[in-house]
UniProtKB/Swiss-Prot annotation:
It is found in: Mitochondrion. GO terms for cellular component: mitochondrial inner membrane; mitochondrial small ribosomal subunit; mitochondrion. GO terms for biological process: mitochondrial translation; ribosomal small subunit assembly. Component of the mitochondrial ribosome (mitoribosome), a dedicated translation machinery responsible for the synthesis of mitochondrial genome-encoded proteins, including at least some of the essential transmembrane subunits of the mitochondrial respiratory chain. The mitoribosomes are attached to the mitochondrial inner membrane and translation products are cotranslationally integrated into the membrane. The gene is RSM19. Gene3D superfamilies: 30s Ribosomal Protein S19, Chain A (3.30.860.10). This is Small ribosomal subunit protein uS19m.
Length: 91
């Protein structure tokens, strides 16, 4: 596991930012976990689970893989829309 840059910015004695989530229910039923906790650290127990992370407007569906461990949930749900220039015709 490679620690994320954000994970290193938090003091070691505080530990990772953990939010109580219904993990057992999600494992048994297979339902996605809806959360607004974008600052929660992804733990190894989350691998294989489906999350719906709030980006300020809607819930973005994400499935956790091993590469995501140590990162924050909010890193995978962008809050800003990409800008696309649309050219208009002058009449």
């Amino acid at each position: 596991m490679q620690p994320a840059a954000r994970l290193l910015s938090r003091s070691v004695w505080k530990g990772p930012n953990i939010v109580p989530l219904p993990i057992r229910e999600a494992m048994t039923k297979g339902t996605p976990i809806r959360t607004n906790a974008r600052a929660a650290t992804i733990l190894p127990q989350f691998v294989g689970l489906k999350f719906q992370i709030h980006n300020g407007k809607e819930y973005v569906p994400i499935e956790i893989s091993e590469d995501m461990v140590g990162h924050k949930l909010g890193e995978f749900a962008p809050t800003r829309k990409r800008f696309s220039y649309t050219q208009t015709k002058n009449k």
